[in-house]
């Protein structure tokens, strides 16, 4: 036994090496933990075959120990409810199994005391009481966030036209004092969600006012009284008046300050204009707002109510823009209920009731596709739009030459899926465009997609449904039902009633179906078949290397690198004792680096041979063999023989075999010449026996 104070001893089950965890048994060994603080010996952990053995199987140097983990789990039946801990050294990881949890904790505590390990901070599971608690001022920090973020979180479930800005009551004064221009307080306004039973015309009044903006709209200033009878920015005025919603402030008063707001386009709500008042007076929505209330003015400035509408030639009718319910109510006094929506605009006259002055063509040509209008349609969410292609615009001009024409809104780039849904319905009512106006000759009926997985091409026009070709044959015959092919096609006229249209044509048989099925030769009687070889699959590497893993109760202990620096690895690490039971015998360890044993003259020879300093140079003696490759092909040329460098500093790369191509004719000539020379030499020596042979 080695010296040192015995700190702990007991029975433990030891794991085999990491690469043999699945194939070798975990054997029970007697472990002894020794501390050399008093005697000066190293701190070691020894294990013996039994408790009365005198020679240890192996000695584990604890100076090389890096970490100790307690409470591991191993995916093996015999270790399901075991108490496993490991000792992680530089050379190997030792997994040890204790009989009880107290014994495991005792071993771990003793080893950590000797090695100076402390619990690491990388424990995956923390005590329930150690979870971070929210500070007392956390709700205050959350409430003092920008109101815009609170509004987004509170109104995330509402549709886009009803994005409300909700400010807590205790933050109203705080937000106004800090910066009242950062956000808009809609305290004096009320909004409500749209009813599910609203009609399409009523839903046209609840479009968002924050979709478009342009510099063509007049600024929100109080216009002069002389502007009340003139068109503004290409729009006609209207005699109807809409008032702003009532303010809850008691000091608000009614004033005659007006906001002249232009109107937007709409495909389903058109203004009703009498011929007598069309030329003299246009239509304009005038909003009467109190000038004494600064909050309403600030509100109206922040609400984006501008349009991307350039001036249009002629008397083009503009559809009035609608606002969400509650934002602008139909009231003339401030004490009226603000939840009443504005009145529905009058329906348009028939085409024959209007004067020729009211009719104008579409102000955008087919080439002006980049400067089309960008106006959201009322009654829909801003993500939907109405689109008319260039070909459809040309047809629209032909069909509506004597009818009313309207400015067509441009599609939003975010959504191109919806095309002319409401616009098509409106023109179908007005008899401007019929359902079958698009001729079927213009549709490509014979289109065959090259990609069999691609769906049939959808036409850009949505006036009519795409014509489904009954006899459409795709490129791949596997995806087509040939049984229904030609059933709707009548027979040719010259055939008469010889073939019934209900009789399907003969189904073509693919070439692959004509091949006979494979024959199983093993089904023949009295057939002698060799048994299939037994497949022994090697154990996968990941299964061999599978080791005990960490669990939620695993605790790790390691040395603090800042306080206890790692000592350098000693020269003699490996044990010289036998370990036949665990296959850890290392008595015959041979270093892989030959430089460690270069002083041995019996292995590699002297370094001074041939002036070389490398121990890998082979000694040049009588037994050095050179190989010659005899090539009997006379057509090949003989390459020059390389000279080996024998000076100082020759490397291992120079010690290689040179292969020489030998010519057959030259070899035979040399052989005959040498034989003739040898015969002549022997005859000469026989005549003069006194002459010594050189």
From Swiss-Prot:
Changing residue 83 to C: In a breast cancer sample; somatic mutation. The modification Phosphothreonine is found at residues 387, 638. The modification Phosphoserine is found at residues 251, 253, 266, 304, 402, 454, 651, 683. GO terms for biological process: angiogenesis; cellular response to mechanical stimulus; endothelial cell chemotaxis; epidermal growth factor receptor signaling pathway; insulin receptor signaling pathway; intracellular signal transduction; positive regulation of angiogenesis; positive regulation of blood vessel endothelial cell migration. Residues 145-157, 204-231, 362-386, 594-611, 685-694 have a biased composition (Polar residues). The modification Phosphotyrosine is found at residues 627, 659. One of its GO terms (molecular function) is signaling adaptor activity. PROSITE patterns: PH_DOMAIN. Pfam families: PH. Residues 122-164, 194-231, 323-386, 493-532, 544-656, 671-694 are annotated as: Disordered. The modification N-acetylserine is found at residue 2. Residues 5-116 form the PH domain. Disulfide bonds: none annotated. InterPro entries: Gab1-4-like (IPR046355), PH-like_dom_sf (IPR011993), PH_domain (IPR001849). Keywords: Acetylation, Deafness, Disease variant, Non-syndromic deafness, Phosphoprotein. Residues 194-203, 672-684 have a biased composition (Basic and acidic residues). Phosphorylated in response to FGFR1 activation. Phosphorylated on tyrosine residue(s) by the epidermal growth factor receptor (EGFR) and the insulin receptor (INSR). Tyrosine phosphorylation of GAB1 mediates interaction with several proteins that contain SH2 domains. Phosphorylated on tyrosine residues by HCK upon IL6 signaling. It is linked to Deafness, autosomal recessive, 26: A form of non-syndromic sensorineural deafness characterized by prelingual, severe to profound hearing loss. Sensorineural deafness results from damage to the neural receptors of the inner ear, the nerve pathways to the brain, or the area of the brain that receives sound information. Adapter protein that plays a role in intracellular signaling cascades triggered by activated receptor-type kinases. Plays a role in FGFR1 signaling. Probably involved in signaling by the epidermal growth factor receptor (EGFR) and the insulin receptor (INSR). Involved in the MET/HGF-signaling pathway. Identified in a complex containing FRS2, GRB2, GAB1, PIK3R1 and SOS1. Forms a tripartite complex containing GAB1, METTL13 and SPRY2. Within the complex interacts with METTL13. Interacts with GRB2 and with other SH2-containing proteins. Interacts with phosphorylated LAT2. Interacts with PTPRJ. Interacts (phosphorylated) with PTPN11. Interacts with HCK. Belongs to the GAB family. PANTHER family: GRB2-ASSOCIATED-BINDING PROTEIN, GRB2-ASSOCIATED-BINDING PROTEIN 1. This is GRB2-associated-binding protein 1. The gene is GAB1.
């Amino acid at each position: 036994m080695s010296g040192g104070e015995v700190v702990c001893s007991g029975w433990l089950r030891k794991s085999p090496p990491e690469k043999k965890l699945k194939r070798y048994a975990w054997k029970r060994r007697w472990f002894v933990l020794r501390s050399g603080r008093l005697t000066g010996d190293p701190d070691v952990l020894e294990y013996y075959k039994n408790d009365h053995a005198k020679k240890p199987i192996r000695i584990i140097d604890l100076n090389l120990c890096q970490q100790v983990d307690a409470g591991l789990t191993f995916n093996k039946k015999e270790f399901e409810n075991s108490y496993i801990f490991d000792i992680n050294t530089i050379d190997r990881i030792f997994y040890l199994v204790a009989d009880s949890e107290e014994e495991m904790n005792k071993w771990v505590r003793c080893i950590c005391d000797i090695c100076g390990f402390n619990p690491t901070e990388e424990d995956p599971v923390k005590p329930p009481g150690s979870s971070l608690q929210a500070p007392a001022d956390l709700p205050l920090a959350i409430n003092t966030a920008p109101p815009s973020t609170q509004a987004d979180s509170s109104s995330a479930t509402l549709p886009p036209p009803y994005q409300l800005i909700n400010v807590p009551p205790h933050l109203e004064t705080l937000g106004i004092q800090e910066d009242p221009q950062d956000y808009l307080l809609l305290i004096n306004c009320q909004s409500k969600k749209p009813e599910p039973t609203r009609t399409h015309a009523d839903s046209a009044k609840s479009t968002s006012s924050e979709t478009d903006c342009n510099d063509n709209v007049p600024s929100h200033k109080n216009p002069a009284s002389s502007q009340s009878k003139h068109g503004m920015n290409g729009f006609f005025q209207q005699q109807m008046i809409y008032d702003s919603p009532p303010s809850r402030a008691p000091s608000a008063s009614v004033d005659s300050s007006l906001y002249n707001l232009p109107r937007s386009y709409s495909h389903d709500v058109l203004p009703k204009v009498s011929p007598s008042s069309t030329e003299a007076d246009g239509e304009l929505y005038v909003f009467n707002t109190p000038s004494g209330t600064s909050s309403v003015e600030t509100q109206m400035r922040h609400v984006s109510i501008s349009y991307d509408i350039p001036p249009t030639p002629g008397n083009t009718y503009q559809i009035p823009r609608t606002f969400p319910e509650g934002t602008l109510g139909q009231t003339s006094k401030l004490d009226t209920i603000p939840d009443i929506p504005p009145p529905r605009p009058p329906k348009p006259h028939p085409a024959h009731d209007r004067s020729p002055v009211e009719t104008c063509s579409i102000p955008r040509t087919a080439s002006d596709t980049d400067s089309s209008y960008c106006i959201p349609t009322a009654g829909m969410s801003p993500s939907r739009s109405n689109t008319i292609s260039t070909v459809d615009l040309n047809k629209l001009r032909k069909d509506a030459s004597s009818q009313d024409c309207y400015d067509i809104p441009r599609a939003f780039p975010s959504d191109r899926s919806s095309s002319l849904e409401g616009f098509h319905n409106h023109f179908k009512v007005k008899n401007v465009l019929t359902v079958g106006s698009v001729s079927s000759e213009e549709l490509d009926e014979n289109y065959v997609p090259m990609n069999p997985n691609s769906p049939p091409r959808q036409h850009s026009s949505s006036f009519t449904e795409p014509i489904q070709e009954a006899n459409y044959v795709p490129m791949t015959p596997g995806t087509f039902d040939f049984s229904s092919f030609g059933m709707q096609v009548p027979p040719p006229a010259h055939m008469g009633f010889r073939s019934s249209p209900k009789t399907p044509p003969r189904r073509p048989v693919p070439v692959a179906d004509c091949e006979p099925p494979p024959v199983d030769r093993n089904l023949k009687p009295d057939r002698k078949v060799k048994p299939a070889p037994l497949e022994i699959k090697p154990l996968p590497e990941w299964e061999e290397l599978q080791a005990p893993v960490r669990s939620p109760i695993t605790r790790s202990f390691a040395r603090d690198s800042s306080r206890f620096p790692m000592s350098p690895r000693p020269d003699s690490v490996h044990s010289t004792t036998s370990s036949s039971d665990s296959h850890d015998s290392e008595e015959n360890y041979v270093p892989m680096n030959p430089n460690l044993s270069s002083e041995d003259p019996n292995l590699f020879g002297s370094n001074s041979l041939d002036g070389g300093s490398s121990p890998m140079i082979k000694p040049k003696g009588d037994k050095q063999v050179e190989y010659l490759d005899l090539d009997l092909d006379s057509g090949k040329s003989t390459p020059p023989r390389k000279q080996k460098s024998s000076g100082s500093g020759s490397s291992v790369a120079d010690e290689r075999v040179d292969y020489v191509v030998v010519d057959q004719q030259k070899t035979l000539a040399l052989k005959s010449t040498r034989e003739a020379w040898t015969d002549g030499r022997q005859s000469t020596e026989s005549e003069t026996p006194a002459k010594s042979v050189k």
